[in-house]
Amino acid sequence: MEHIGFFPPHDGVSLRALAEHLGAELADEAFAGVIIKSIAPVYRAGDGDVCYLLSRKNRAELETCKASAIICLPTLSSLVPEHIPVLLSKKPHTDFALAGALLHPQAMRPVALTSTPTLISPTAFVDPTAKLEADVGVEPGAVVGPGAEIGEGTRIGAGAIIGPGVKIGRHCTIGGGASVLCSYLGNGVIIHNGARIGQDGFGYAPSPRGMIKIVQIGRVIIQDNVEIGANTTIDRGTMDDTVIGEGTKIDNQVQIGHNVRIGRYCAIVSQVGIAGSAVIGDGVQIGGHTGINGHIQIGDGVQIGAMSGVMNSIPAGERFAGIPARPLWDFLREAAEVAKRSGAREKKDGSAEHD
């Protein structure tokens, strides 16, 4: 089947201009005028495409590669066929991401559902007391509640709900069907389709008559340039705030409980659950399907492996994995020992069957 993308190619950027934009080195100036229009993987890259190379594993694909340029480490440039221009980079993955943003800026935000995303649809409802700055787009079926404030260049997707008094900064995108209640958002925030921000936290007091609801009167504070994936849920605080720090990226289907405080530039992969009042430091990376206990602290720069169960606080800079989570090398040694013993047992059982 022919590959037809939803994001049309760029009009074209010269390889010299792309190298300057990335701060990369063009290996051969004879290729300075080559025009780059899009990005693609090595195996599918064709005329006008740029791809990137991280290791020797793609060596076989390079033999048939038809890309117009390849971004790679200087130590790997000898693997690239002579007819393909090379951009030498110390950080090819990052530079490839920057190239994608340059060539496909429209893909940096959730897809607009109308051809006039900077206008207010006649089928949207915007309360008369709401304040919208210039160039705010509100797509069909969206609701902007009383007293809400929305900054310049922000787009509210179809069917989205912006609650009373919510403040949203400039150049944000709220995806279709998302809801934002009891929240303050900074600038450049992206919330993908179906996310739920600022609903009740899960708070109940046990009693002889059953569970008594604890009112949740806090807020959600989302700082600048945060991105929140589809169908992720972030509860508002009980009395204090739930806070997501600047530049943090949260994948799809993540649950963040009330009063959680997440630092800056964290990466949280899909299906992570963070229980109430946990404190996550700056630059933390959490693998998918991990559970974080409430009322614990995760230090700056911690890395947590996928499908871990974090019961206790973790000091800064550590790498943890497993259930319960423990230092990575302890987990790997234990896993190797279990595998070794299991293999020995299977070998013994097999020998017994042949006797």
Curated annotation (Swiss-Prot):
The active site is at residue 258. The keyword Nuclease does not apply. GO terms for biological process: lipid A biosynthetic process. Pathway: Bacterial outer membrane biogenesis; LPS lipid A biosynthesis. GO terms for cellular component: membrane. It is an enzyme of class 2 (transferase). It comes from the Bacteria. Catalyzes the N-acylation of UDP-3-O-acylglucosamine using 3-hydroxyacyl-ACP as the acyl donor. Is involved in the biosynthesis of lipid A, a phosphorylated glycolipid that anchors the lipopolysaccharide to the outer membrane of the cell. This is UDP-3-O-acylglucosamine N-acyltransferase. It comes from Rhizobium rhizogenes (strain K84 / ATCC BAA-868). The gene is lpxD.
